[in-house]
Amino acid sequence: MKRFMQIWKPAVIGFLLLTLVCGVLYPGVVTVFAGVAFHDKANGSIIEEKLADGTTGKVGSAEIGQTFTEPEYLIGRAASDGVATNLNPTSEEQKQLVEKRIAWWHKLDPTNNRVIPMDLVTASASGVDPDISEAAAAYQVDRISRERGISTKEVKEIIAEHTSNRLLGFWGEPTVNVLQVNLALDRLKM
């Protein structure tokens, strides 16, 4: 029995110590730090708006894309809808999905004869991207302006207000947050 305790006692103590450090202390410190330093992001970047009935309600997250299909809204990337998004770029299935999405865009705005930006006809890896490229937003300006009866200048200004720049001025591409633009467009009615 003494030999058994000599072998297992350090293992059990090590297990309990690592469980305490890795399972309680570290996650607790990180959670508290995130809540203090990055309060908004740590809590889901929830956007609250004044609703039609005068109350304030949660309308979405700035970090998770919502589906918009109405022509008066800025429309984001295609949702993956349970379809694998890691298809080979040259596969027949990917080609058919892209062709279907191109047809949808032409049906939505038959007067727009510009080339559809790639991010509007391909799905993201996560399927929930909240942002689109500046080119994808610019592609939709005329339609939104026409549908809402406002100037293209107003639409462009709203898009510019909700465009994030490159990280550190050189990393990545500027992106436009779809939900924030659509909420700003809806605020014009008020």
From Swiss-Prot:
<keyword id="KW-0813">Transport</keyword>
<dbReference type="GO" id="GO:0071805">
    <property type="term" value="P:potassium ion transmembrane transport"/>
</dbReference>
<keyword id="KW-0630">Potassium</keyword>
<dbReference type="GO" id="GO:0005886">
    <property type="term" value="C:plasma membrane"/>
</dbReference>
<feature type="transmembrane region" description="Helical">
    <location>
        <begin position="13"/>
        <end position="33"/>
    </location>
</feature>
<keyword id="KW-1003">Cell membrane</keyword>
<keyword id="KW-0406">Ion transport</keyword>
<keyword id="KW-0812">Transmembrane</keyword>
<comment type="subunit">
    <text>The system is composed of three essential subunits: KdpA, KdpB and KdpC.</text>
</comment>
<keyword id="KW-0067">ATP-binding</keyword>
<keyword id="KW-1133">Transmembrane helix</keyword>
<keyword id="KW-0547">Nucleotide-binding</keyword>
<keyword id="KW-0472">Membrane</keyword>
<keyword id="KW-0633">Potassium transport</keyword>
<dbReference type="GO" id="GO:0008556">
    <property type="term" value="F:P-type potassium transmembrane transporter activity"/>
</dbReference>
<dbReference type="InterPro" id="IPR003820">
    <property type="entry name" value="KdpC"/>
</dbReference>
<dbReference type="GO" id="GO:0005524">
    <property type="term" value="F:ATP binding"/>
</dbReference>
<comment type="function">
    <text>Part of the high-affinity ATP-driven potassium transport (or Kdp) system, which catalyzes the hydrolysis of ATP coupled with the electrogenic transport of potassium into the cytoplasm. This subunit acts as a catalytic chaperone that increases the ATP-binding affinity of the ATP-hydrolyzing subunit KdpB by the formation of a transient KdpB/KdpC/ATP ternary complex.</text>
</comment>
<comment type="similarity">
    <text>Belongs to the KdpC family.</text>
</comment>
<dbReference type="Pfam" id="PF02669">
    <property type="entry name" value="KdpC"/>
</dbReference>
<protein>
    <recommendedName>
        <fullName>Potassium-transporting ATPase KdpC subunit</fullName>
    </recommendedName>
</protein>
